[in-house]
């Protein structure tokens, strides 16, 4: 059952002109699984007979008793432009959560987890990071993450502090950065890790072409645990 809660913006961090990281304090805080998404509306009411216009965003943090959640929002249309204009520190909005099936495996606590993320598709992966560290099983975690430039490199500190060093693979597509390949993620990058494709859990999050490409490649080698989250 979903929860409707007012939320207050407690911090805003800009990553260039088109991406922002929002920290929200929920009025009503209930447990949600890492990888879930929510609906955010700027139409603030005490109750709704019909849910108003909204946009969905992956929750970029794991559940916390403090009721603080993180969202990563990219300005891509009229409504997200409104969010950028209207949501500042101290502003309120309403969220409806939690939804989705892009979730960590419930019954398998040992097989590797490989996340392939492009751009703001890193959001649910960040929630996985926090949850796996909390569960003490982050050693099974592999992350392939591509981003445009240093400004749009999201939450590197979290990734580096949780994902084992040799299992964190970063790619900068539009800016030459030290020690980071200046290109997109390629299929050869996945293959060279020698995953057991029948046992590893693969999570792909990015735009449609990004997601379809890696899904097709994984299916082609017999991968059986593939989860996608397109945007």
Predicted region positions:
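Ferredoxin-reductase
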Residues: 2-91, 147-149, 174
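FNR/FR-type flavoprotein reductase catalytic core
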Residues: 2-3, 76-231
């Amino acid at each position: 059952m979903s929860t409707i809660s007012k939320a207050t913006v407690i911090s805003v961090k800009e990553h260039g002109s088109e991406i922002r990281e929002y920290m929200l304090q929920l009025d009503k805080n209930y447990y949600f699984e890492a990888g879930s998404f929510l609906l955010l509306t700027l139409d603030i009411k005490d109750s709704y007979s019909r849910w108003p216009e909204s946009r969905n965003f992956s929750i970029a943090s794991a559940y916390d008793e403090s009721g603080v959640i993180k969202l990563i929002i990219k300005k891509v249309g009229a409504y997200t432009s409104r969010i950028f204009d209207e949501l500042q520190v101290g502003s309120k909005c309403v969220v409806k959560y939690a939804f989705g099936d892009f979730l960590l495996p419930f019954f398998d606590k040992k097989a590797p987890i490989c996340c392939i993320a492009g751009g703001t598709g890193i959001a649910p992966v960040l929630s996985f990071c926090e949850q796996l560290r909390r569960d003490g099983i982050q050693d099974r975690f592999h992350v392939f993450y591509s981003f445009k430039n240093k400004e749009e490199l999201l939450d590197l500190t979290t990734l580096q502090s949780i994902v084992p060093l040799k299992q964190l693979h970063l790619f900068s597509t539009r800016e030459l950065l030290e020690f980071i390949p200046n290109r997109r993620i390629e299929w050869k990058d996945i293959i060279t890790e020698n995953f057991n494709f029948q046992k590893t859990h693969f999570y792909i999050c990015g735009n449609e072409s990004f997601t379809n490409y890696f899904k097709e490649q994984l299916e082609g080698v017999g991968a059986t645990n593939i989860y996608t989250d397109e945007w």
